């Protein structure tokens, strides 16, 4: 079975902003590979597969201190995700998808049983795309409930985001997570919410490179500066 890059990046639906899922999907038999490089010599790898025209699944795994002479610190488990689009986008209505993702971002806190940035857990998201002179623009609104509640904060929360194309090869990303599930006494957040932004370059029909600034509002005392991350993405078909 061969994996063949067959789509231009700009023709693919954005499945994710920086962290926030959208209502976008991989095509049937589509393959997505992701590598994220984050602080603490951390690497997070993910594989997603389009099972049919309205659904996809994925797995991910990673860890920190992968380089250097420190003890390797792997995440405690392989994480899973799935997404189904329940409503197709129309001229006046957004696409609507529901899904589940157990993968959070950053290092895993063994005491609180959570990632630095909690996973979205179960979520519903609406996405609407528009064509503008410079390129497409997508608006996204979601609500979610994470199951990483070892800190005692299990509130529902939500997020908003936008992706804007600048020509054929560059996309600017921005998202704001309200962080309502990360503002209790034992939480890592401090109530400001999480604002992330990024820029994504299409390198070829199969590859994209992305640079992200995360937690720009510096939500939480453990974040004196925004996080800088690098992401490499591959798209193909099997």
Name these PLM-found stretches.
Residues 3-5:
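N-terminal signal peptide c-region/cleavage motif recognized by signal peptidases
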Residues 7-137, 143-148, 163-171, 175-238:
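Transmembrane beta-barrel domains of Gram-negative outer membranes and organellar outer membranes
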